[in-house]
Amino acid sequence: MALLQIAEPGQSPQPHQRRLAVGIDLGTTNSLVAALRSGLSEPLADAEGRVILPSAVRYHADRVEVGESAKLAASSDPLNTVLSVKRLMGRGLSDVKQLGDQLPYRFVGGESHMPFIDTVQGPKSPVEVSADILKVLRQRAEATLGGELVGAVITVPAYFDDAQRQATKDAAKLAGLNVLRLLNEPTAAAVAYGLDQHAEGLVAIYDLGGGTFDISILRLTGGVFEVLATGGDSALGGDDFDHAIAGWIIESASLSADLDPGAQRSLLQAACAAKEALTDSDSVEVAYGDWKAQLTREAFDALIEPMVARSLKACRRAVRDSGVELEDVHAVVMVGGSTRVPRVREAVAEAFGRQPLTEIDPDQVVAIGAAIQADTLAGNKRDGGELLLLDVIPLSLGLETMGGLMEKVIPRNTTIPVARAQDFTTYKDGQSAMAIHVLQGERELISDCRSLARFELRGIPAMVAGAAKIRVTFQVDADGLLSVSARELGSGVEASIQVKPSYGLTDGEIAKMLKDSFQHANDDKVARVLREQQVDAQRLIEAVQGALEADGERLLDAEERMVIDLQVQELTELMKGTDGYAIEQQTKRLSQVTDAFAARRMDQTVKAALSGRNLNEIEDI
């Protein structure tokens, strides 16, 4: 079924006129913009013929410099030149301080706890720095295509959380760009290869960029790109290779590790140059100041082996999550400039048992795929029909239930966009409000998951416990942003929230959440069962105590009351321990000894309801 294209007044396109839309790869090290031209998706070059724009921004007192010239000034003006700003997107001030010496900037905080970089132009947020990069790409596209853009598809790592995705959208808005969609980088690569080769089957997208690593397992069938599983590391990339070589230089040259920002930047530039030279050479001369030495590819491979191994571990986990075997994967697509490193390609080939695909420039493939999707979303028809993309969420979403348990509403690796609803009820008689605690993670207890947001549903009509019906709906849009609503179905009272955390996960937390869920799976199940038994026991105790207070003296003799009190006391004591089986059995015993009491209360209620009524009135009830 075709979608109606609705435009704002004055923006409707002329018949047969293409709407100008682009795909943007906003990368850690480099950025690109691409568009469909004459039926082919291709990157757009600047006036000098360069398609790659270094993600470098230098601030002068009266102007902003972006790209190659800014990158070259990184050593001479390190405090005003910002590199790898993508690593700061959606982060808090405390997060970036943990990176320490890796970031040679002066950070200042604000009321929002967002990190600001102190420059000659004043404090600059990561969103503002990213916006300056996006402005240059927008201007390049409009100059090349000869018109104003209707929008852009901007790619983000699959592991970007809500805060990082929202920060990317904010940067685009600041740059004057209408975001048609945020697209996961691995999915964009699949679009590029799927269109060109009409591939069907299982494909692994190995994306190693400057600052992030993503692995995705996709099923390609008849134009449908379905992401079966994602994984990766939000703090692994070519920058880490540079730091490994820089560490080798410091050790080999007997340098002090406490370098000033300019020296640190020069050191990293020397390391990066050596890394790039070793792509085509077996050895390279590394020079830093008066010191010189030969770095062989073999020695470089040894330096980066732990990082390569980390990436392959994430690959194996993603394959396992997707429910397939390594041998089922028929193609491996390489994305990101860091996949040019020979050892990376060798290791991937060894792990998957086949040579990876590198037919499309790994630096350009993401932007090329994004441009294809942008053209479709802009309403331009393409030969071959529509293209359907099915992204997934990387971490489960849910909410807190009684006992501090995490109830998953949308499991990880669920295709997005998605909406899921689940019904809950009240725990206590007369409960008029419910606290909704939204969580993210894979563990069973809320203490082991990440808190995303809290809100309250008020105005629930007074009822006995369990009578109210509250429907909680989770909606994740195509950009991975979450909104949660809660509605009491009887009265219609409703409350909702859009989850936009003030800052994202710290480096390593995303991978750690998945790792911990695997390591503690059995313990978590045992803990969950215990909590559920404790909650059931507490609910029964409260119900029994309420009944005793209301009708105990009237309906029970002294011996019956003593038996029930003893059973309540024993269950209360057992709940303090960790013997789930004993709690379960004692809960059953308490339920059994109170059966007769419950029956008497029911009889009394029925008698009271029928008292004073005639037969016709009773039949009408």
UniProtKB/Swiss-Prot annotation:
Entry's family note: Belongs to the heat shock protein 70 family.
Keyword entries, A-Z: ATP-binding, Chaperone, Nucleotide-binding
Signal peptide positions on this chain: none
Molecular function (Gene Ontology), one example: unfolded protein binding
Function: Chaperone involved in the maturation of iron-sulfur cluster-containing proteins. Has a low intrinsic ATPase activity which is markedly stimulated by HscB.
Annotated Gene3D superfamilies: 1.20.1270.10, 3.30.420.40, Actin, Chain A, domain 4 (3.90.640.10), Substrate Binding Domain Of DNAk, Chain A, domain 1 (2.60.34.10)
Membrane-traversing stretches: none
NCBIfam families, A to Z: HscA, PRK05183.1
Name listed for the protein in its UniProt record: Chaperone protein HscA homolog
Biological process, per Gene Ontology: iron-sulfur cluster assembly
